[in-house]
Structure formats: C-alpha cells, structure tokens
Amino acid sequence: MSGRLSVDPARVTIDNRYYDDIGDAWWQTRKGPVAGLHAMNPTRAGYFEKVLGPLKGRTLLDVGCGGGILAEELARRGADVTGIDMSVSSLAAANRHAAAGATRDSVRYAASDALALPFADASFDAIVSSDFLEHVPDLGRCVREMARVLKPGGVLAFDTINRTFLAWVIVIGVMEVLVRRIPRHTHDRRLFVKPSELASALSAAGLALVETRGLSPEGNPLANLVRVARGFDLRFAVTSDQNVSYLGYATKA
C-alpha cells in the first residue's frame, strides 16, 4: 500500500503535457477533448456541494483545476474559488472563460505545483481535487500539502480512478485505445489510486476519511460506448460501484 504514496516518475508513461495543448477547447462541452469532464461535472459539483455544505462566502481551493470547469461551477454555487494548476495555457483558457462570465469576481487562478502550494497554513475553508490524484506520482506529499492549507474543521473532497483491472480496461483500453476519446498516455495504471491507499495518505496527513462512493455513467454499457464514440453524451450518478471511479471526502480536526 505504501508504494503508491510515492511512485518513481521514471517508471510511469503518463504525459500530462497533453493538457497544455487544449487551449479554449477546454470549454467544448460535447465533442471536445475533455467532453468527459463536462459530462461528469454536474454530478461531481452536486456531490461536492452536498458534503462541503453551504458554499456562499466560503474560500475554496481547486487543486489541479485545468481549464476551470469545476472551479467555475463551484463559484457559481457561491464559493470564493482559487484554482491552481501547472499548465499555464490551461489557466489562460480558464481566465478567458471566467472573464466573460458571471463568476469573474469569485474565481481566480494561479500557476502552482500541488506539491508546493504557495499558500499559508490553514488558508482555505474547503479543498476539492477532481480528476487529478491519478496524475500525481507523489500522492503522499500532495495530500500533505492540501491538508496543510486546509483550515481546522475544513473538508477535502475528491474524485479519482481506482486501480482495478476494470478501470484499466475502460479508462485506458477503451477510452485511450479503442474509441480514442483520450490521448494515449494521459493515464498510467500504476498511478490509479485504491480507496485504501488514499485513506492511508489522508490519515498520514492528519485527515479523517468519511466516505467514498462510486461515480458511474447511467444506462446500458454498450449503448454508452456508442454515445462516447459519437461525442460523450452521458449522464453520471453517485453509486455504490467504485470499481472504476470514486469520489469522497475527508475532514480535518
């Protein structure tokens, strides 16, 4: 279990530079390169709002925010959001989109490494990390940094990909190889995170895991495969099935 807390980057084939090339296509909702994130966003945001509690006026950090899809939605729901990411071009797209919308005064972005967050201890009421932990070799250090900047009594909410055979088949075999909705090497199975491993990382950082739940597409799997190939016209739901993706939250005493 402890091996996943810090994986040698030289052993993985993940290529996060893909995100630098997306540009304003971050906001193409149906057939764009991150259409899957848009499809999952309503369910993710709804779950996060539920476990975080009322968002109005609360400071929230989005770690690994990319083009700002989740950050903007949580700002729209009332949070005062700061999003961080290492992809400068993704942040530029996030800023352009935010500047043209109703949330421009309640969301801001900064280029930062999640392993060395540029914030003082106990800076945020809440933290979210969505579709990010499965890209981080040093999971333990990343979680410790998030715990450091979270206020006592705060909540860290997350979603990520489980390290199972089924997740490897669907995320890499189907999405990257078969239907090519995700570029090759966007993911590496060795960086997928089992719930027990994340629980260990959270505990070591002084956070208490409260729950994990599944995040799954609704409908028939074969019909969903056709929908994905045509443009990711899917709906997602919080379920009991954590075999592929799961979300959850932890608290800081």
What are these regions (language model features)?
Residues S2-P54, V155-V179:
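Conserved class I S-adenosyl-L-methionine
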Residues G101, L178, S200, A204, ...:
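A C-terminal cap/extension of S-adenosyl-L-methionine-dependent methyltransferases
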Residues T160, R180-E197:
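Acceptor-substrate binding/catalytic loop of class I
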